[in-house]
Amino acid sequence: MDIRISSEGINISPKSKLKIQKKIGTKVEKLLAHLSQDLKTGHLRIEKLKYRQYKANFEMLLPGKNGRIVAQNINHQLLTTVTGLREIIERQITKYKNLTFNPKKKTKTTTLN
């Protein structure tokens, strides 16, 4: 899983970037194991807001009609923000998989005359 991390108002050390990539990437990798590696690219943007808050935005495009994964989380601690973001991403990917690979079958009702 390739996660491109950019930041605004904060310098993120390489060690922290590695932690963030591991925290998000491992779970997303497991959920999207059926896709090829080049399709699993996400963009993570981290901003430092006023009052010591961190805002994390994540975007990822997957194949299919419902393939846009977008998540946002705000918290006072950077890693807690990333953990909350990961949970949102997990829910959205699960929803994407259910809609794409297990679509509800439309059944036709027949009327008896």
Predicted feature locations:
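N-terminal, polar/charged subdomain of small-to-medium soluble alpha/beta proteins
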Residues: 1-113
